[in-house]
A protein has these predicted regions:
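Basic, flexible linker segments flanking DNA-binding modules
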Residues: 1-85, 191, 247-253
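Mobile genetic element proteins and their domesticated derivatives, centered on retroelements
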Residues: 10, 25, 41, 45, ...
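RNase H-like two-metal-ion nuclease catalytic core shared by retroviral integrases
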Residues: 64, 68, 162-164, 170-171, ...
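An active-site-proximal beta-strand-loop segment
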Residues: 79-127, 133
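Active-site beta-loop-alpha junctions of metal-dependent nucleic acid enzymes
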Residues: 111-112, 130-153
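Short small-residue beta-strand/loop micro-motif enriched in glycine and branched aliphatics
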Residues: 123-129, 184-187, 211-212
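C-terminal domain-tail junction helix/linker
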Residues: 178-182, 204-256
Length: 256
């Protein structure tokens, strides 16, 4: 088989990146200095039965809005998500996941897990995150602290964006931003498009590691999310980033 070497390489890429369609596999091959026709890649993937199974599910979005319980910041980002400067514009939000556990009476019960990531709008990289069993101020503040430390090398004044969730209205949250001379920005009430960068990340995350899979403990789901975030940051290539992963793109930009 003259294509055996190519088939082996495509198989390797597929094992590492199960969500890649033929266009991404073609780009990953080019990144590995293997130059072949795009149609050939598509043909081999069909032959090897490497189809991408996308599970999409309309689920009710987790809503952390509890009314005006603290200070509302202006929408400084105002959908200007693009920036050529790493660590300048950061966005955050909370999303929930479900998992199953057997209680002491032997019944299967639904439990929830909450993820609080801080994401760099420059390259879509997840800079820090908190994972908890209940909506947690401590989880948000811990991830916020890490994000502030990581982005402290930014030469310009930073902006941290969020929706109007109760955690981002807390004095503890906004005062830390103030102390570090960071602008606080908030979406308009009930307008998810004002934070579409984070909505998009949540959609990709859930499609690629959550929908279609059942998790049977908090630890199992937490571990899957942590492994996915590492993969998303370091390996998952994006067309928008010149077919590089978020970390690769940042390092390339800094080296230029």
């Amino acid at each position: 088989n003259p294509d055996k070497q190519l088939e082996d390489e495509i198989t390797k890429i597929h094992i590492e990146n199960k969500d890649y369609g033929y266009r991404r596999v073609y780009r990953e091959l080019r990144n590995r200095k293997i130059f072949v026709n795009k149609k050939k890649v598509q043909r081999i993937m069909q032959k090897l039965c490497f189809q991408v199974t996308s599970f999409t599910r309309k689920s009710r979005r987790y809503n952390s809005y509890k009314g005006n319980v603290g200070k509302i910041a202006p929408n400084r980002i105002n959908r200007r998500f693009n920036t050529s400067v790493p660590h300048q514009k950061i966005t955050t939000d909370t999303t929930e996941f479900k998992y199953y556990e057997i209680d002491n009476k032997g019944r299967m019960v639904i439990k929830k897990l909450y993820l609080d990531p801080f994401l760099d709008m420059f390259n879509g990289e997840v800079l820090s995150y908190g994972i908890s069993k209940t909506p947690s101020a401590a989880s948000v503040l811990s991830a916020q602290k890490q994000a502030i430390e990581i982005t402290s090398d930014c030469p310009y004044r930073r902006t941290f964006h969020s929706d109007r969730g109760w955690a981002y209205q807390m004095g503890a949250y906004s005062s830390v931003l103030k102390e570090n001379k960071i602008f606080q920005s908030m979406s308009r009430k009930g307008n998810c498009y004002d934070n579409s960068v984070m909505e998009n990340f949540f959609g990709i995350l859930k499609q690629e590691m959550y929908y279609g899979t059942t998790y049977y403990s908090f630890e199992e789901l937490k571990d899957a999310i942590e492994r996915y975030i590492k993969y998303y940051n370091e390996k998952r290539i994006k067309e928008k980033l010149g077919w590089m992963s978020p970390v690769e793109y940042r390092l390339n930009t800094l080296a230029a």
